[in-house]
Curated annotation (Swiss-Prot):
PROSITE patterns: COMPLEX1_ND1_1, COMPLEX1_ND1_2
One cellular-component annotation, GO: mitochondrial inner membrane
InterPro entries given in the database record: NADH_UbQ_OxRdtase_su1/FPO, NADH_UbQ_OxRdtase_su1_CS
Record's subcellular location: Mitochondrion inner membrane
Record carries keyword Mitochondrion: yes
Classification of source organism: Eukaryota, Metazoa, Ecdysozoa, Arthropoda, Crustacea
HAMAP family: NDH1_NuoH
Family to which this protein belongs: Belongs to the complex I subunit 1 family.
Keywords of this entry: Electron transport, Membrane, Mitochondrion, Mitochondrion inner membrane, NAD, Respiratory chain, Translocase, Transmembrane, Transmembrane helix, Transport, Ubiquinone
Encoding gene (name): ND1
Protein name: NADH-ubiquinone oxidoreductase chain 1
Species the sequence originates in: Artemia franciscana (Brine shrimp)
Role summary: Core subunit of the mitochondrial membrane respiratory chain NADH dehydrogenase (Complex I) that is believed to belong to the minimal assembly required for catalysis. Complex I functions in the transfer of electrons from NADH to the respiratory chain. The immediate electron acceptor for the enzyme is believed to be ubiquinone.
Gene Ontology BP terms: aerobic respiration
């Protein structure tokens, strides 16, 4: 079992490497340029070159930082991302747990602590402010995300990924029957993973990055690896819940992640919170009541 989990982690790392290449290629064509095309054939080795460069950089600790939390936070964030991948239903040697959906929700809730600790332990006011706004954003959108996840689970009465996938494949669960809920889910996971147009946690186009301002080299690479691994997992979870684990839908959601980065400007923070509490939360509660009534009727 350990061998298969190790193999799975390696596959996720390779997928993340090529996801970064795909993102840079898509952004390049959106901005009418080529993107990376120098390292290897058509730039295919560019992510490995970037990885070697990042992991070979010198790690200099900020003088007034809290060293242990500063070093542990990126590792913990990456561990949580890999832990979620052990629950996916297509790995028969993965973790067997009857409440795997509940475990996914718990792991996503704990992930906010790595952001908070990373910003606080850097002992920089810019990192601290970035971690505070990232924590508030993540906690706010987790409320809507949990309600959205519970809506189809209540209909099928399954709390494990594998059982839900089997039952939904028998019944059929096309996205066009629940398009508003799918759109709410996609908007919420964009905010949950701190992606454009909700990338207020990083603010990469600003002069000061955010909670990862003081990170460099290995620490920065681990934070980025955990972010992109979470993107892949959220896309897979979307395809499991709404598309009976369709590979085409998984690719479409990943592409939509990357496309939104090249198409939309960043939201203002007050608009971000208004969208969560005044639009997504009432809509998700309405769907929760609707699916609960369907489950009671059946």
């Amino acid at each position: 079992m350990i061998y298969f989990i190790f193999l799975q982690v390696v596959m996720v790392l390779v997928s993340v490497a090529f996801l970064t290449l795909l993102e840079r290629k898509i952004l390049g064509y959106i901005q009418l340029r080529k993107g990376p095309n120098k390292v290897g054939f058509l730039g295919i080795l560019q992510p490995f070159s970037d990885g070697v460069k990042l992991f070979c950089k010198e790690v200099s600790l900020p003088l007034v930082s809290n060293f242990m939390p500063y070093l542990v936070a990126p590792v913990f964030s990456l561990f949580l991302s890999f832990f979620l991948w052990t629950l996916v239903p297509f790995i028969s040697y993965g973790a067997k747990f009857n409440l795997s959906f509940l475990l996914v929700i718990c792991a996503m809730s704990v992930s906010v602590y790595s952001i908070m600790v990373a910003g606080w332990s850097s002992n920089s006011k810019y990192s601290l402010l970035g971690s505070i706004r990232a924590g508030a954003q993540t906690i706010s959108y987790e409320v809507s995300l949990i309600i959205i996840i519970l809506s189809p689970l209540m209909l099928f009465k399954k709390l494990d990924l594998e059982g839900y996938l089997v039952k939904s494949s028998y019944v059929g669960w096309p996205l066009y029957l629940c398009l508003p809920l799918g759109l709410c889910w996609f908007t919420t996971i964009l905010a949950e993973t701190n992606r454009t147009p909700f990338d207020l946690a990083e603010g990469e186009s600003e002069l000061v990055s955010g909670f990862n301002t003081e990170y460099m080299g290995v620490g920065f690479a681990l934070i980025m690896l955990s972010e992109y691994a979470s993107i892949l997992f959220m896309s897979l979870l979307f395809s499991v819940v709404f598309g009976s684990m369709s590979f085409l839908m998984f690719c479409l959601v990943v592409y939509s992640y990357l496309w939104s980065r090249g198409s939309y400007p960043r939201y203002r923070y007050d608009n971000l919170m208004h969208l969560c509490w005044k639009s997504l939360l009432p809509t998700s509660l309405m769907f929760l009541c609707f699916y609960w009534s369907l489950s009671q009727g059946g």
